[in-house]
Amino acid sequence: METQTATQSQTQSENAMQRFVRKTRALFAQEPDLDKRWNSLRPILAELLADPEVIAASKQWPDCVPANGRAENLLFYEDPDYGFAINGLTKGEARQGQRARIHDHAHIYTLYGVLDGHEKVVRYDRLDDRSKPDYAEIRESSDVLVGPGEIDLVKPYEIHTEITVGERTVAVIIRSQKGGDFNQGRYVPEENRYYESLGPRQTHCEMLPKG
């Protein structure tokens, strides 16, 4: 009984990110199938995106600024056992009207959840047989305006980009592995060109204020 009471007390004192981590670790322990695992993670992320404390705290998160050819992500958490990472991505005034490079996330799974603001998510199909190096033919397959609470699952090697629409946008991104230490695919459709480069720089940040 004492153990149960202690567990209940600990659960009640959790903040939104701690609760997300606990539920995600439990899911990863129970579900080995990656597609099922990442689809089952959607409602857990939706709960995090709806948390008033997270929404309020995000107003103070620093803007992510590309530098030296690399994007920037805020790094809130990296799991020591399962390897998943919780990132933030804030796009302020400096990023308005810009399209992120068309890219894939290489071998990892990613859940992209919009926390605040609106932006367009554009996806592409790959048309060539991948036999030629530095070459790719892609075609736009969807163009969707997304807003707070909407979640996009990006599976390995799926091609996409995000486009700002004139307002500050904030996303919480869950990755199966922290980005930045491996190359990701980049696509230049006007030239049918493909190349690879490192993913986003990781800037450590607190999701929620301490105390």
Predicted regions and their residues:
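A short, N-terminal "cap"/entry segment at the start of jelly-roll beta-barrel domains
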Residues: E2-G83
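Conserved short histidine dyad/triad with adjacent acidic residue
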Residues: A85-H105, L145, K155-E158
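Short beta-strand His + acidic residue motifs that chelate non-heme Fe in jelly-roll/DSBH
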Residues: A100-H103, V121-V122, V154, H160-V165, ...
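Glycine- and acidic-residue-biased ligand/ion/polar-headgroup-sensing regions
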Residues: H107-D125
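Short acidic-glycine-tyrosine-enriched beta hairpin
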Residues: L111, D125-T161, G199
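A short hydrophobic beta-strand segment most commonly corresponding to one strand
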Residues: L111-G113, G166-N183
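Long hydrophobic alpha-helical segments typical of transmembrane helices together
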Residues: Y187-G211
